[in-house]
């Protein structure tokens, strides 16, 4: 039976996102467990002036960090320009 990941697992994912300085915010964090597999998907908000390559590299970096925390997970990170979508949780910077 499919179920949402526990709050503790979601907190780990949120901490990974919060710690990445290139992530300005994120939304649509969706998690699922089916049998022994985990599925994690999130939309991140990044600097709209970055190149496609830079955006891809950021997404890859975050996917790898989440996969290190959850080795059995299928992870999808979708980058979007900051300010163009609803943000459920904003990452604050020290600027």
What are these model-derived regions, one by one?
Residues 1-95:
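Alpha-helical transmembrane segments and adjacent TM-loop junctions that form the membrane-embedded core
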């Amino acid at each position: 039976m499919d179920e949402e990941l526990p709050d503790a697992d979601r907190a780990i994912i949120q901490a990974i996102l919060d710690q990445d300085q290139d992530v300005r915010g994120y939304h649509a964090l969706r998690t699922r467990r089916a049998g022994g597999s985990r599925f994690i998907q999130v939309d991140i908000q990044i600097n709209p002036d970055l190149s496609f390559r830079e955006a891809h590299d950021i997404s890859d970096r975050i996917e790898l960090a989440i996969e290190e925390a959850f080795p059995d997970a299928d992870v999808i990170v979708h980058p979007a320009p900051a300010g163009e979508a609803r943000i459920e949780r904003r990452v604050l910077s020290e600027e």
